[in-house]
C-alpha cells in the first residue's frame, strides 16, 4: 500500500509493517495505525508515522540508547491487551521533542510506547514512577 508521510513523502509499505494502537495515542485517539520508518540509514531516530494522516508523525527512539538505567515493569493489563508472552517480542520507544540546539532535545520517559513486535500491537503507557518525567535531556544519558 502507498501512504503519504511527513518526512519521506509518498512511500510504499507492506501491510505487515503496520502497528495497531487499539485506542490510538493519547490526544490522537482516532489514529490507530502507524508504521515505524527510519529517518536515515545509520540514525537511532525513527518516525512513528500515521498511516491515515501524513502530517501526524512522531520522532521516536529506543530510550535505552540514551538512558542506560531506564527500567520499568509493564502492568498485567497491558501485557494482556498486547498479547505479550515473551519479553523478546517487546520493543520500547520514547517520543522525542526535537529542540534547537539539538542537545536540548528531550525524551518522554514518563509515557513509553510498548510494542509487541510479533503481533504488531502497541500502547503508550503512563508510568507512575516519580523519577521519570516527560522531558529528559537525551544528552544527559541518565535517569
Curated annotation (Swiss-Prot):
Q: Which gene encodes it?
A: fliW
UniProt cross-references to InterPro entries, sorted A to Z: Flagellar_assembly_factor_FliW (IPR003775), Flagellar_assmbl_FliW_dom_sf (IPR024046)
Q: Which domain of life is it from?
A: Bacteria
Q: Where in the cell is it found?
A: Cytoplasm
The protein's name: Flagellar assembly factor FliW
One of this protein's GO BP terms? bacterial-type flagellum assembly
The record's function comment reads: Acts as an anti-CsrA protein, binds CsrA and prevents it from repressing translation of its target genes, one of which is flagellin. Binds to flagellin and participates in the assembly of the flagellum.
Q: Which residues form a coiled coil?
A: none
Q: Does the keyword Chaperone apply?
A: yes
Name the keywords, alphabetized.
Bacterial flagellum biogenesis, Chaperone, Cytoplasm, Translation regulation
Query: What's any one GO cellular component for it?
Result: cytoplasm
Q: Which organism's genome codes for this protein?
A: Bacillus velezensis (strain DSM 23117 / BGSC 10A6 / LMG 26770 / FZB42) (Bacillus amyloliquefaciens subsp. plantarum)
Q: Which Pfam families match?
A: FliW
Its quaternary structure?
A: Interacts with translational regulator CsrA and flagellin(s).
PANTHER family cross-referenced by the UniProt entry: FLAGELLAR ASSEMBLY FACTOR FLIW (PTHR39190:SF1)
Similarity annotation: Belongs to the FliW family.
